[in-house]
Amino acid sequence: ILGGLDTSDFGGVWIRNTSLKDLNKEERTIFRRRNIGFVFQQYNLIPSLSIRENIVLPMRLDGKEIDVDFFNEIVETLGLKDKLERFPSTLSGGQQQRVSIARALLTKPAIVLADEPTGNLDSVTSMEVVGLLKSCAVRFHQTILIVTHQEEVAQMADRVIRMSDGKIYTRDCNDC
């Protein structure tokens, strides 16, 4: 619902002063592409596109110019600079997830939604990816919401909201 993939039965979601409920399906698709970055458990990279092409795809679909300086800063931060001409199948899972993060950040979205971004990664790589998400949040002034079942991942967050059976049962604030 928060990502605009589905609509709510009651209540609402507002992002950048826009009610998602007021948008039709096509408008929500465009709004999502411009305002919400997604990082999924499955990296959702297109195998036939290079790493560079995968990262810039949302901008190309939207007909937007690429901010080259911002692109370079993102790929440098995520350690992808020397991998841009490679293809997804030649990268490790952690590297593919970094590409997914870069793609999510490039459009400068209002929020990045990361759904189990470490689910397919080993514990060391998981902590590395979460650390990168956290440093990107600070460096790029980005709101990142992570959904996880891993307690170690949750403990790295500034705020933790725990849910069970669709209801919030605790709220923790680690650094606020």
Map each language-model feature to its residues:
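H-loop (His-switch) and adjacent beta-strand-loop-beta switch element
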Residues: 160-173
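ABC family nucleotide-binding domain
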Residues: 1-156, 160-163
